[in-house]
């Protein structure tokens, strides 16, 4: 066997010296060499952004393999499946290279063996490993190796709801029913449902599942905070802290003021109250027996109204400023006194109710424990589990079976983990159990820990960091701070921000010289002043921003988008490719607005959502559920998915009417009962639903019969054709991609059957196994531009790098600061457990005739949990900004919005330890405010970024510009080109078939799909292409020509507002309009603002006419039946071409219709100019008949009322056709 000794510390130092003396262009740093070769102890590598941690891991693994450690003797945990695949690929490539350089047969044989074992080595996510372990050893817990992973959220929710409902009923009827009702009411209030209580139970359950031992956590930690809470003690501590804190500061402030005020404002009446307050405060600080509560109330009485307020009107400007400063500071002190008084009141009430809260929460604890157990039993019965179950099974197997744990410890030479900062406590316990105590290699960066929402705990990394830093015998700490990604302009700006912002208090780590980014190469240090980091702020009036627009999910403003577009066009003109530019957004709420604006300016933009899983694409999921339902209609999930799909369009009301036909049983049985009207409530099955049921049952029966004697490939195409589903997705956004996905599904089914496997059931089973394993079928190539600007979330960008980066919405409020942030009725903390708001009845404490006087009180644990959660949330936001800023290679832009006047004046110059004060950092609610506070407090030369406010005048269309598009090639210029003999022969052949083409023109020119607009020649007189003017029909009219001329668009021309553009905008407005009992002009204006059209086009939309429509009988009918309204509804149907007698598909979009019980009311908006309504009635008679026929066939309903809503005349007209 191949064996080589590992390097000693002295040999590692020698390697470091040799590397330093080498003439390599890019040398390994001493820390990288240490990380690659150190051994014999636990190692924590703190790797800053761009420091080459993946390179270090690969080199370390290769070094161990080169010393005789087999790849199967390593446990390597990655954060994602993709990262595992990339690591395996790198290792295989490098080992193959080493194999070619091997000098001995023994070495070649060993390396060949390692390459062969890469596929089965333990390199992957922790989820993948635990599944593998439970598959092998699950029998020790009674878990079958054929278990299935529940990846469908709907399936999980349904099973949880069933368990919860049964348990809830048991508790409502149990011995503690009265206390349980009080518990439920505490969280549901006056709600008629227990949903709020159910959400609490689910949240506690989910939180516990992220711990290493959920049952232990529920028993020991869930109520820990409440058990340890001592309101009386907290009250005394609060009062004790008043003397040396708030009251002493208030006294010093009043004394200073009185000395000046008696001279400058000698006759002011408020000074008597100031003197009395000073006397009270001085007495309290001298006398230890002072009743602090009584003192507090006296001070608040003195300061009530204008008691301590300086109401004088000095003429001197300095005195005026002094007066205002005094009043402001005084008000702040009084506000703090009132806050203390409120806290004392709450603590007093909590003291009286503390004995009532704990029994109630103990009952909640019992409920959650019972729910957790019964939910697990339900999953065991179905042999289907969640990822967290498998992880806990794996922990139990290793803890309860020492021989299994020892076998793994003996197997692994090293236990390695990447992205260690994002580990959960469950994962950490697994690593402890697999390790022998001194063979762990952990790589990560706490500054990039951004996954708390996945229960990752950065404190795990931090504890290890501090332990190894303070006690080297416990393990070796290696810091990789050299950055090999970014230019010095990006690194300097990042260091400038976080050296003044991040520390242990906020951010969880002290950002000092130890953690500062350092350029790893000389080339990175070369100055490029033009690439200095820019903070670009769209200068807007804050009063124009409502509270509803603020918060974590606020929309991006048009000014910010214009600002970004202008900078991108400038970069493009300088020769920067679009693919080198990336936009980083806090979430996907901004995507639509950005895509619309970028398209208007001719800039290609690709959001990350394009790179979605093939099996998770909506159209493929619908087809898979269709196949599942055909294979087994008793599969409730698949059946309901098929019913709800666009193929059958059952809505929630329809499904409810079906569900009430039986108390229990499968949904398919209820559906059949509804169809035959033999269920419990046949009266609720109306005519429209009855027609839907008939169509569905007949179609499903037909498909099931067809599947028995035809291939899956043929079945899939029959489904596409029977319900026009393939055509339907062709009318949706990204139609080409969707149709390619559906086409690929049919091809893959065909390929599957060619391997010898037959049957729908087997095919579905194969797909389900792929999904359960977390894998996917090979993606169909995305039909997106290659040279395009990228758009992704900051979370998605982690681990990636881009030349030019725009960080968007710097003004977005953090979750902890938004009005919805931490305002719920409970907060869960890992250490202190559950903190709640308690609904206390104060009737006995307050003299009142009311039957109850309920007041919501924040328990001590709730307050403590909120403080910790808020601080943890702000720290993660700071780390998220660090991730965003360190993605850039060349230049970084930080983009936001705000008032220049406010942002430049609201922060002071106070600093603490060369950082912004902790209180200020904690109070600030946005990235932008952090940046502006730094800009005010520190010198620009220390920050290395510039702040520029951009005005509306700089964002006019002329100032922004447009992407230049190369002129189209003029076909006439090619007329004299030389022609080869092959081209001449081809032209001859083409000319010879011209006669045949003319003879069979109707059939040849017949497209497989037509729209109603293309069929106007079937049912109306001759008309122009715009469909505006009706002309006299002439003899000898030639057939419709289908010339193949393709004119390239001229992007340089000035946009001309056409009638078609106004019509499209009007249609989109009516589609986007939110309907209520009444429609106002404001509603229409808001809907118009969301229309994706130019301002010139929007200006031509006649809102007054549209508003008048809702005063007509048809408009009132629509408002009264909003739940039955369908808008912009796609349809497809077969029709016969009169010339060729060939069938073709008619496909189009219906503006809208009402699906009533006895009839369908169809309507269509027309913006054509007219002098008399009868003109348009005649013109669109055939088109409306076509729509009516399609609806009649789809819903099996004969009566269809047809209306045209005419907007192109002097007055609005509603005409029945």
Swiss-Prot record:
InterPro entries: AddA, DNA_helicase_UvrD-like_C, DNA_helicase_UvrD/REP, P-loop_NTPase, PDDEXK-like_dom_sf, PDDEXK_AddAB-type, Restrct_endonuc-II-like, UvrD-like_ATP-bd. GO terms for molecular function: 3'-5' DNA helicase activity; 3'-5' exonuclease activity; ATP binding; ATP hydrolysis activity; double-stranded DNA binding. GO terms for cellular component: cytosol; DNA helicase complex. Residues 26-487 form the UvrD-like helicase ATP-binding domain. Residues 515-799 form the UvrD-like helicase C-terminal domain. CDD domains: DEXQc_UvrD. GO terms for biological process: double-strand break repair via homologous recombination. Gene3D superfamilies: 3.90.320.10, P-loop containing nucleotide triphosphate hydrolases, PCRA, domain 4. Keywords: ATP-binding, DNA damage, DNA repair, DNA-binding, Exonuclease, Helicase, Hydrolase, Isomerase, Nuclease, Nucleotide-binding. It catalyses: Couples ATP hydrolysis with the unwinding of duplex DNA by translocating in the 3'-5' direction; ATP + H2O = ADP + phosphate + H(+). ATP binds at residues 47-54. Its cofactor is Mg(2+). It comes from the Bacteria. Its EC number is 3.1.-.-, 5.6.2.4. The keyword Transcription regulation does not apply. Disulfide bonds: none annotated. Signal peptide: none annotated. HAMAP family: AddA. Heterodimer of AddA and AddB/RexB. Belongs to the helicase family. AddA subfamily. The heterodimer acts as both an ATP-dependent DNA helicase and an ATP-dependent, dual-direction single-stranded exonuclease. Recognizes the chi site generating a DNA molecule suitable for the initiation of homologous recombination. The AddA nuclease domain is required for chi fragment generation; this subunit has the helicase and 3' -> 5' nuclease activities. This is ATP-dependent helicase/nuclease subunit A. It comes from Streptococcus thermophilus (strain ATCC BAA-250 / LMG 18311).
């Amino acid at each position: 066997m191949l064996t080589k000794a590992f390097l000693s510390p002295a040999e590692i130092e020698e390697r470091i010296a040799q590397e330093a003396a080498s003439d390599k262009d890019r040398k390994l740093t001493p820390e990288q060499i240490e990380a690659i070769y150190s051994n014999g102890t636990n190692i924590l590598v703190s790797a800053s952004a761009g420091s080459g941690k993946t390179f270090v891991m690969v080199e370390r693994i290769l070094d161990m393999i080169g010393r005789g450690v087999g790849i199967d003797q390593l446990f390597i945990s990655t954060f994602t499946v993709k990262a595992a695949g990339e690591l395996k690929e790198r290792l295989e490539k490098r080992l193959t290279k080493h194999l070619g350089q091997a000098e001995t047969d023994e070495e070649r044989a060993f390396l060949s063996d390692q390459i062969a074992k890469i596929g089965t080595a333990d390199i992957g996510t922790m989820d993948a490993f635990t599944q593998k372990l439970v598959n092998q050893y699950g029998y020790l817990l009674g878990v079958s190796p054929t278990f299935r992973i529940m990846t469908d959220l709907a399936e999980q929710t349904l099973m949880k709801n069933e368990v919860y409902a049964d348990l809830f009923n048991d508790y409502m009827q149990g011995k503690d029913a009265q206390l349980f009702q009080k518990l439920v009411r505490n969280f549901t209030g006056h709600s008629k449902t227990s949903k709020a209580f159910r959400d609490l139970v689910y949240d506690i359950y989910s939180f516990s599942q992220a711990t290493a031992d959920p049952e232990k956590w529920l028993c020991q930690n869930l109520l820990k905070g409440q058990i340890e809470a001592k309101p009386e003690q907290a009250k005394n501590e609060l009062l004790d802290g008043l003397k040396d804190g708030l009251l002493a500061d208030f006294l010093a402030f009043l004394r200073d003021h009185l000395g000046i005020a008696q001279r400058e404002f000698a006759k002011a009446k408020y000074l008597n109250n100031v003197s009395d307050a000073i006397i009270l405060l001085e007495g309290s600080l001298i006398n230890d027996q002072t009743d602090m509560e009584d003192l507090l109330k006296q001070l608040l009485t003195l300061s009530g109204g204008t008691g301590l307020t300086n109401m004088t009107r000095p003429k001197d400007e300095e005195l005026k400023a002094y007066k205002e400063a005094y009043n402001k500071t005084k008000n702040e002190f009084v506000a703090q006194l009132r806050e203390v008084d409120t806290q004392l009141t709450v603590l007093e009430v909590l003291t009286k109710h503390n004995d009532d809260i704990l029994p109630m929460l103990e009952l909640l604890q019992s409920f959650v424990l019972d729910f957790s157990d019964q939910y697990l039993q339900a999953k065991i019965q179905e042999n289907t589990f969640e990822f967290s179950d498998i992880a806990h099974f794996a922990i139990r197997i290793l803890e309860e079976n020492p021989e299994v744990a020892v076998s793994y410890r003996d197997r692994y030479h090293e236990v390695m983990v990447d992205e260690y900062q994002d580990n959960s406590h469950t994962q950490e316990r697994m690593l402890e159990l697999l390790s022998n105590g001194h063979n762990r290699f952990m790589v990560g960066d706490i500054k990039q820990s951004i996954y708390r929402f996945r229960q990752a705990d950065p404190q795990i990394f931090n504890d290890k960091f501090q332990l190894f830093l303070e006690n080297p015998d416990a393990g070796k700490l290696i810091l990789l701070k050299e950055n090999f990604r970014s230019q010095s302009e990006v690194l300097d700006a990042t260091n400038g921000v976080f050296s003044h912002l991040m520390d242990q208090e906020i951010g969880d780590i002290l950002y000092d010289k130890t953690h500062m980014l350092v350029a790893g190469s000389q080339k990175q240090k070369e100055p490029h002043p033009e690439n200095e980091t820019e903070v670009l702020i769209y200068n807007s009036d804050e009063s124009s921003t409502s509270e509803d627009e603020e918060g974590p999910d606020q929309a991006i403003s048009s000014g910010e988008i214009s600002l970004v577009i202008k900078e991108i066009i400038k970069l493009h003109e300088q020769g920067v490719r679009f693919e080198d530019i990336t936009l980083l957004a806090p979430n996907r709420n901004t995507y639509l607005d950005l895509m619309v604006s970028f398209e208007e300016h001719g800039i290609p933009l690709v959001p990350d959502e394009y790179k979605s899983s093939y099996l998770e694409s909506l159209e493929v999921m619908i087809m898979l559920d269709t196949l599942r339902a055909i294979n087994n209609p008793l599969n409730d999930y698949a059946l309901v998915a098929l019913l709800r799909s666009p193929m059958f369009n059952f809505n929630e009301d329809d499904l409810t009417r079906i569900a009430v036909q039986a108390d229990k049983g499968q949904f398919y049985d209820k559906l059949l009962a509804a169809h035959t009207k033999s269920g419990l409530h046949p009266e609720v099955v109306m005519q429209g639903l009855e027609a839907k049921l008939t169509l569905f049952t007949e179609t499903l029966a037909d498909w099931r019969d067809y599947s028995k004697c035809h291939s899956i490939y043929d079945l899939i195409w029959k489904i596409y054709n029977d319900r026009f589903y393939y055509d339907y997705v062709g009318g949706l956004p990204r139609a080409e991609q969707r149709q390619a996905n559906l086409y690929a599904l049919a091809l893959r089914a065909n390929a599957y059957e060619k391997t010898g496997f037959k049957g729908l059931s087997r095919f579905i089973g194969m797909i389900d196994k792929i999904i359960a394993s977390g894998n996917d079928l090979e993606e169909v190539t995305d039909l997106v531009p290659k040279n395009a600007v990228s758009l992704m979330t900051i979370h998605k960008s982690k681990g990636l790098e881009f030349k030019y980066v725009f960080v968007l919405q710097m003004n977005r409020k953090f979750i902890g600061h938004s009005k919805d942030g931490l305002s719920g009725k409970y907060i869960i903390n890992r250490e202190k457990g559950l903190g709640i708001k308690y609904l206390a009845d104060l009737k006995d404490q307050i003299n009142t005739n009311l039957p109850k006087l309920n007041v919501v009180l924040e328990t001590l644990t709730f307050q403590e949990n909120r403080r910790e959660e808020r601080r943890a949330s702000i720290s993660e936001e700071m780390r998220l900004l660090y991730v965003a800023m360190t993605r850039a290679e060349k230049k970084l832009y930080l983009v936001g919005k705000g008032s220049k006047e406010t942002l430049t004046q609201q922060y002071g110059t106070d600093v603490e330890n060369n950082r912004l004060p902790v209180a200020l950092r904690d109070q600030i609610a946005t990235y932008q405010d952090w940046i502006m506070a730094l800009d005010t407090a520190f010198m620009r030369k220390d920050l290395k970024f510039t702040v520029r406010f951009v005005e509306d005048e700089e964002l006019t269309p002329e100032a922004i510009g447009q992407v230049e598009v190369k002129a189209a090639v003029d076909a006439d210029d090619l007329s004299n080109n030389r022609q080869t003999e092959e081209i001449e022969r081809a032209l001859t052949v083409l000319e010879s078939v011209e006669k045949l083409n003319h003879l069979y023109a109707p059939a040849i020119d017949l497209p497989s799909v037509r729209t109603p607009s293309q069929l106007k020649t079937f049912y109306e007189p001759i008309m122009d292409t715009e469909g505006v003017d009706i002309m006299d029909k002439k003899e000898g009219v030639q057939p419709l020509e289908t010339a193949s001329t393709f004119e390239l668009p001229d992007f340089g021309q000035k946009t001309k507002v056409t009638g078609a553009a106004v019509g499209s905008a009007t249609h989109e407005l009516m589609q986007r309009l939110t309907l209520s009992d009444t429609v106002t002009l404001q509603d229409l204006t808001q809907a118009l603002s969301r229309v994706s059209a130019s301002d010139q086009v929007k200006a031509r939309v006649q809102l007054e006419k549209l508003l008048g429509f809702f005063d007509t009988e048809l408009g009132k009918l629509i408002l009264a039946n909003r739940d039955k309204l369908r808008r912009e509804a796609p349809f497809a149907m077969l029709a016969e071409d009169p010339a060729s007698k060939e069938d073709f598909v008619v496909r189009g979009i219906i503006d809208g219709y009402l699906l009533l019980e006895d009839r369908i009311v169809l309507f269509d908006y027309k913006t054509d100019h007219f002098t008399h309504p009868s003109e348009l009635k005649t013109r669109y008679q055939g088109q409306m008949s076509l729509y009516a026929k399609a609806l009649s066939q789809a819903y099996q309903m004969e009566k269809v009322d047809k209306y045209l809503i005419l907007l192109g005349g002097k007055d609005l007209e509603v005409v029945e056709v």
